[in-house]
Amino acid sequence: MGGKNKKHKAPAAAVVRAAVSASRAKSAEAGIAGEAQSKKPVSRPATAAAAAAGSREPRVKQGPKIYSFNSTNDSSGPANLDKSILKVVINNKLEQRIIGVINEHKKQNNDKGMISGRLTAKKLQDLYMALQAFSFKTKDIEDAMTNTLLYGGDLHSALDWLCLNLSDDALPEGFSQEFEEQQPKSRPKFQSPQIQATISPPLQPKTKTYEEDPKSKPKKEEKNMEVNMKEWILRYAEQQNEEEKNENSKSLEEEEKFDPNERYLHLAAKLLDAKEQAATFKLEKNKQGQKEAQEKIRKFQREMETLEDHPVFNPAMKISHQQNERKKPPVATEGESALNFNLFEKSAAATEEEKDKKKEPHDVRNFDYTARSWTGKSPKQFLIDWVRKNLPKSPNPSFEKVPVGRYWKCRVRVIKSEDDVLVVCPTILTEDGMQAQHLGATLALYRLVKGQSVHQLLPPTYRDVWLEWSDAEKKREELNKMETNKPRDLFIAKLLNKLKQQQQQQQQHSENKRENSEDPEESWENLVSDEDFSALSLESANVEDLEPVRNLFRKLQSTPKYQKLLKERQQLPVFKHRDSIVETLKRHRVVVVAGETGSGKSTQVPHFLLEDLLLNEWEASKCNIVCTQPRRISAVSLANRVCDELGCENGPGGRNSLCGYQIRMESRACESTRLLYCTTGVLLRKLQEDGLLSNVSHVIVDEVHERSVQSDFLLIILKEILQKRSDLHLILMSATVDSEKFSTYFTHCPILRISGRSYPVEVFHLEDIIEETGFVLEKDSEYCQKFLEEEEEVTINVTSKAGGIKKYQEYIPVQTGAHADLNPFYQKYSSRTQHAILYMNPHKINLDLILELLAYLDKSPQFRNIEGAVLIFLPGLAHIQQLYDLLSNDRRFYSERYKVIALHSILSTQDQAAAFTLPPPGVRKIVLATNIAETGITIPDVVFVIDTGRTKENKYHESSQMSSLVETFVSKASALQRQGRAGRVRDGFCFRMYTRERFEGFMDYSVPEILRVPLEELCLHIMKCNLGSPEDFLSKALDPPQLQVISNAMNLLRKIGACELNEPKLTPLGQHLAALPVNVKIGKMLIFGAIFGCLDPVATLAAVMTEKSPFTTPIGRKDEADLAKSALAMADSDHLTIYNAYLGWKKARQEGGYRSEITYCRRNFLNRTSLLTLEDVKQELIKLVKAAGFSSSTTSTSWEGNRASQTLSFQEIALLKAVLVAGLYDNVGKIIYTKSVDVTEKLACIVETAQGKAQVHPSSVNRDLQTHGWLLYQEKIRYARVYLRETTLITPFPVLLFGGDIEVQHRERLLSIDGWIYFQAPVKIAVIFKQLRVLIDSVLRKKLENPKMSLENDKILQIITELIKTENN
């Protein structure tokens, strides 16, 4: 059956359909359109989207030269025009070495991946066809599927394998790697030749005719003819592509059918190319090349022969493949006169001659029917009517009777359009000419209305032959399909069998692994899971021998020190409750002790318990008491006090010491220690190693009323452990009356209430302080708030020299706010006080008023003769430092009459120890403290308390997913606690720096921390301890956090690669992060700093992130400070600028001593205290990383040494930036490049982040940065607009190595990170980065399994380090 039909595609799965579509038309536009069908909708670059849209636009004229990847299917050409999409290129030699490392790693780690149980032969076939559509070779496809599916891979894995393992010249078009100059090509539009020929009908036996070239034509003319033929084919294919693009009315069914004619044209062009190559190789006597070319020729001919048998193939396109047989001159036809040679059709005369030679029998039939048997239209009339209706512009069909001996057949010609003519001629012969015309009309209708049931409207005899043709076509199609797909189906069957066998082995292996799961791990990260609890037998544990400890305690009781302090202990309010406390603990496993501040519960309750366990021996087979404290300073000071009370001479952890302490990075305990004070975090880490606290007999949780995240988390775990351990006792100690909530949480356990030893405290509020001190609030004071101003219009008359009067309208600001706004309560105070109350800024701490108050205490008759310390509550270290400086520079406090002490957890222990010692008579001790002095520690001689009413809380903003340390007002409970600190030794006085009215508006209690902070670290601990999903676990909390907050925390952990995507399970990185008590992002940065040998500088940068920048900006000297910072700027990075300043400070300190150090700090506007703090925190972080098993390598050591005298090299800068990205991702944004018209004009750097646009903060060295690229930022803050603080310009490599979810878009030559960060890259390079991530994960996993393993000579880390350092070189 001949004729030309509309294009169809073969039905297949969606992904295969997309891949076939992508490979059909060899043009950039079609490539993009095809790939787009297989992708989920994601945010794409504007240029790529435009390119995709362009696939439906008409072809444009030749444009300027552009640079793109060498591919006719390359869609990245337009993307290359967008400079904001950065290109990624790797040195060729380094690329080959990296591929070698990747392949070597795969060989060494031959662990089979988990295979999906849903793989079927149909899915494997779809995958095979998808790869085939990309024009990969059959052998390569089979190798890829074998090497990926057996490892749990999919289509993308197979494409990755092919791109990684095939050489560039072996990759199909569209996957080429090299950049080349591309000139857009255009060909003249295809002009259709006039084809008129005798066409073989469908049931004709397959015969091949061979044409011979005239002997007179030379070889050169033959070659030119082949070139013209190839050009004609390409132009024909191009014309079809354009026609296809303009067909907007295609149905889905038509799109899913395969067109053999188009494939045949494509193969014909390739066949001619191969013949030219063969001829060239023959002249060059290149046997190997000639052999390969002949193989290609045979391959193309075999596929073309298969297509010739396709039921919808147009025989007019058929060409001869035989080279060795001479061709006969063709018989001239009408079409040949226009084209000079017949390209696509056989000579009808030649066909007749062959038939005669072979003497094949004719198929003669009688199609006669009577008027009685059929009253409808005849086939001929039906065809004429159909053409008139459906092709109104076409002439009526022509019928040409062809005699064959005494029989007839008919050639029917239907002109569908100027360049589309259908010519058919059945092979069946009839006895008369009219039947031949009806039969020809039936065949024409069969071709024109294929798939429709028109045959039911034809006479029975012609209806039968229609069905005969249809059945023969289906049968042939099935046979061809089976024959073509036989090798593929055989391969898929074998592969599916292997997959099933491996799946069974995996199931058996996992069952064996579960059976052996109780074997102990030789790792410091060994955990006790819920399943292992049943295996722990407490009864069989060795009973502790307490006799030596009891003897030691009896000996200590007889010492003078013990006896002396016993008398002091007996004066404490809690001491008279000793017996009731001990008895209650004997009867109940959980007890709540509610004692007021100063009652002595933190020291005495653990002491009572220890004494009773060691002396009375009440079922005491075990005596190990752990008392948790929220702060390090509390744990240390309480342990010191209890050691003194026990009579231990050598202090906590000393020889024969019964009491010790353990805080982060410091442990003071010995074999005889039976009472351990520790921070809550230390006990949580103990729970990671021993999920049941097997060696602990009593847990005391102090200061539970503070409701920190760690304490609430600890209570959930302890509640579950109590259900599994019948011998564990728990004591909760709270300083507030909110004890019922804790009792209810632990099934209504008993509450012991202990009143504090307190004296009456007189309270003065802000209005009283102003009235008594005579403080005057100046209008220009920084503490005076400015009200909104209203403008009043006035008319001003101005008299000129000539005597004329001009009128001007002016607007004069008028302040709003009046005394009527004050509460009537303040009417009893003076107008000066009322004015100050009205205008004083309540959100700013008035340090001037505090100085006036301190001076007033010494000159007022009411207070000057009262001895006692002054405790001032401030919100943070900055305010402490500021007030300390003011006191030091105020002449009124110069004398030895005053001793000023700053109390903060980051300050030295020696300075803080002075706060607890009594000063000499006549000396006023002034202690500056945060809320640490509220309940955690007790300063014994405090009589005066100055309460600013402010504190700092870490709050989480769900809308922006940002957290910040916010200064806020305290709760009523906290204010009362602060007030109570003044009544410890005598009648006290509390001065509140806020009004009585504001105090009444305070919240009763602070919001629990678990409800207002990010929960990443908490989720890490939950997964580390195998406590199930964080959502389920935290639902058991005293105050469960919102699910959205937990979800945000888990999303962040997934983004940084700390936990698995589909289950609450830690990755190797997450396991290591859980061992570091720091923010997860900083922890990740420290780990990568250690494994890449740059821990020292990274720890310095991490210390800055945990504290604050050392740069200062004095009032009135902003320009000087900015200039000094600019002089230290390095590598477009605020982080490296700070590190550069730190190096200079260390150099000045080492070479010139204190004076040189001070000069350097003043010249560069650096805070020396911040730098000293930074150094201390840095050393502490390094200790933490080493304690987690990451010892510093020789490379890391080289950063330390004499680094202060060196500058950073480009390679070192690249490495540091990469580690910064590893830690701070996904805090990245794309710089919106703005080209300024005026060169001198400085434009603020605008950055597009995942949440929207933001502006670089004015304090950043990148404030005026204008370039194409990406910016890393430390934090995002919102003032009048959103700003990015502490930014660094970064390159693509670190983002590709350490960023979020990476996706390779093979056809577009794009790499996407998290669906919105795009880079241009050849597919091979894209796959390399994807594989390198797997290798990094394997290094971390090995380190987890073997903590002592050295990473210094690891090949993977070495090659990645080299890759990072060589970027842009």
Curated annotation (Swiss-Prot):
GO terms for molecular function: ATP binding; ATP hydrolysis activity; cadherin binding; helicase activity; ribonucleoside triphosphate phosphatase activity; ribosomal small subunit binding; RNA binding; RNA helicase activity. InterPro entries: DEAD-box_helicase_OB_fold, DEAD/DEAH_box_helicase_dom, DHX29, DNA/RNA_helicase_DEAH_CS, DSRM_DHX29, HA2_WH, Helicase-assoc_dom, Helicase_ATP-bd. One of its GO terms (cellular component) is eukaryotic 43S preinitiation complex. The modification Phosphoserine is found at residues 71, 192, 200. It comes from Homo sapiens (Human). Its EC number is 3.6.4.13. This is ATP-dependent RNA helicase DHX29. The keyword 4Fe-4S does not apply. Belongs to the DEAD box helicase family. DEAH subfamily. Residues 849-1026 form the Helicase C-terminal domain. Residues 27-75, 176-226, 502-526 are annotated as: Disordered. Residues 582-755 form the Helicase ATP-binding domain. SMART domains: DEXDc, HA2, HELICc. ATP binds at residues 595-602. It catalyses: ATP + H2O = ADP + phosphate + H(+). Keywords: ATP-binding, Coiled coil, Cytoplasm, Helicase, Hydrolase, Initiation factor, Nucleotide-binding, Phosphoprotein, Protein biosynthesis. Residues 189-201 have a biased composition (Polar residues). Part of the 43S pre-initiation complex (PIC) that contains at least Met-tRNA, EIF1, EIF1A (EIF1AX or EIF1AY), EIF2S1, EIF2S2, EIF2S3, EIF3A, EIF3B, EIF3C, EIF3D, EIF3E, EIF3F, EIF3G, EIF3H, EIF3I, EIF3J, EIF3K, EIF3L, EIF3M, DHX29 and the 40S ribosomal subunit. One of its GO terms (biological process) is ribosome assembly. ATP-binding RNA helicase involved in translation initiation. Part of the 43S pre-initiation complex that is required for efficient initiation on mRNAs of higher eukaryotes with structured 5'-UTRs by promoting efficient NTPase-dependent 48S complex formation. Specifically binds to the 40S ribosome near the mRNA entrance. Does not possess a processive helicase activity. It is found in: Cytoplasm. Its main location: cytoplasm. Residues 222-256, 283-310, 492-519 form a coiled coil.
